[in-house]
A protein has these predicted regions:
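N-terminal secretory signal peptides and thylakoid transit peptides that target proteins
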Residues: 1-17
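C-terminal segment of N-terminal export signals and the immediately downstream linker at the start
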Residues: 25-55
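RNase H-like nuclease fold core
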Residues: 64-98
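Short, well-ordered beta-strand segments in beta-rich or mixed alpha/beta enzyme
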Residues: 72, 76, 129-138
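Beta-strand elements of well-folded, non-transmembrane domains
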Residues: 80, 135-137, 188-192
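Mid-length scaffold segments of soluble, non-membrane domains
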Residues: 103-108, 112-114
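Phosphate/pyrophosphate-binding loops at sites that engage ATP/ADP/AMP, CoA/4′-phosphopantetheine
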Residues: 118-125
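Short, conserved loop-to-beta-strand elements that form functional interface hotspots
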Residues: 146-182
């Protein structure tokens, strides 16, 4: 097999997988690598003490996920654990920053459960593209970013920076469904199954 070098790519233009002799290698290992990644993700979650739960059911008249091409959109996830909402109230009042971070971690875990339900295999996640965090908080609260770090750091810890790093937006609101303190929307890039 030829040596791959950045200089050769820059000088010679496009280098195809065939010219590198990688077509057969990549084609034959794609599904096994995906399966390994999926198992690795679920094992990593178990090692963290957060095994992948069953995907929560929507709390309204909507679908939990929608796939379009290579994008997977996950509806707002609430901090459900074993069918129970775990974090109600307002951050800065009944809920501390640390409790809000833990609630966002649970929302992120539930987003992965939704991805597994839709894709059948977490190894198909190419990357988390964007997250949007909604935070029910008291007037004057300014540490929204710190609270959403619970979800951001979780995705990087579970998927690594390349797949787990993402863009994001967080906003404070007066109320959220069912009285929850946080909700998380997730956009993922995925591979075909």
């Amino acid at each position: 097999m030829r040596e791959f070098s950045r200089r050769r790519v820059m000088k010679g233009g496009v280098v195809t997988l065939a010219s590198l002799g990688l077509i057969g290698v990549l084609g034959s290992t794609k599904s096994s690598l995906q399966a390994q990644e999926s198992g690795d993700i679920e094992q990593r979650l178990r090692d963290m003490g957060m095994p992948l739960p069953k995907a929560p059911k929507p709390v309204g008249a909507y679908v939990a996920t929608r796939k379009s091409g290579n994008l997977l959109f996950i509806s707002g996830q609430l901090p459900f654990a074993e069918g129970k909402l775990t974090c109600k109230g307002k951050v800065g009042q009944e809920i501390s920053i640390e409790q809000g971070q833990a609630a966002f971690r649970l929302c992120a875990l539930n987003a992965l459960a939704q991805a597994k339900e839709n894709l059948g295999d977490l190894g198909r996640i190419s990357g988390i593209l964007k997250i949007v965090g909604y935070l029910c908080c008291v007037d004057g609260f300014v540490d929204h970013a710190k609270v959403l770090n619970g979800a951001s750091e979780f995705f990087v810890q579970v998927l690594g920076m390349e797949k787990g790093g993402h863009t994001r937006m967080v906003m404070g609101v007066q109320s959220l469904p069912l009285g929850t303190a946080v909700a998380l929307e997730v956009w993922m890039e995925v591979t075909e199954g």
